[in-house]
Structure formats: structure tokens, C-alpha cells
């Protein structure tokens, strides 16, 4: 497994520092990270999968006060110049997700949501956990870690290699509808 480049580590550190600072700021009772049934979250941010940088875009829909389903598209930059073939398509993965939200069970402040769940994608399937912090009624931040356990679809063994067995870290912004 390749190590993260120093630039990627620094960017991740910046995002985590920003998230930590915002968590320490007094929050408004109006902002809610998890509204329960019918809540829709759209999120976008930086993604790092096994040392490869990229981005992700996703959405969650709350089926109940505790359970949500959604989808996410992740792209990481895949460079493979040695074989002279275009490998850019290998960097994409679309996943369906299911999460359990712990905010009510753990009696967390309304601006904070901790969740865990599963994801099944075109490239890999695995487990995930994350946290959301809303600093306003509409906008917030998120951080998520996903461990891709197994390769899912595709005949080409190389397609699964980008995601299979890799840890994915992501941070970014959320919008509540």
C-alpha cells in the first residue's frame, strides 16, 4: 500500500483542524445535524482512498429517526503511465449506502450526528463510520472513514485494486434540504 504524500497529509490535517475548531465553537440550537425521518443531506468533499486523492459527492435520505439510505460517487486520481493505457475510469466508484444514526441513542447535541453503516459499490463493499456537524440550519461539515473489504463487480481484476482492501477517508461540506 502506498503511503500518503506529504501534500495530501497536510490537506487532510487542514480539514481535520478546521472541523475540530468548528466543533469547539458555541452552536445555535437551530442547527441540526440529523433531523430524522424525511431528512435529506447532500455532501461533497475531498476523498483519499489508499493514498490516492480525489473527491466524492453523495446524498442520504432518512427512512426513520435512526436509519438512512443513500448513494455516493467517489473519484480518485489513478495514474498508470507504465502500460500506456488510460486508467482514469478505474478511479470511479458508485456506492449505495445504509447508515444507523447514533445521535438520539447517545443523546448528542442536535448539531452533531455520528453514524455507522455499510456501503456496496461497483468496485468494493465495506463498512463506514462518520460524523456530521451543522454550524447553521442548512450547512455543515462531515468526516467519514470507510474500510473497503471486498471487490464487488467487474471482470477486470485491476478495477477492484483501486478500492479493494483500502481505507477511504473523506471530509467536506453538507447541505440539508
Model-derived regions, located:
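Cleavable N-terminal export/targeting peptides
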Residues: 1-37, 177
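Short glycine/proline- and aromatic-enriched beta-strand/turn motifs that initiate or cap beta-hairpins
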Residues: 27-69, 96-98, 103, 176
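Flexible, solvent-exposed coil segments and beta strand-coil junctions
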Residues: 35-39, 107-113, 152-154
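Outer-membrane beta-barrel pore domains and translocons
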Residues: 43-49, 74-76, 101, 119-123, ...
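Gram-negative (and chloroplast) outer-membrane scaffold detector with strong preference
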Residues: 60-139
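Outer-membrane beta-barrel "beta-signal"
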Residues: 94-100, 164-177
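Low-complexity, intrinsically disordered Gly/Pro/Thr-rich segments
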Residues: 149-160
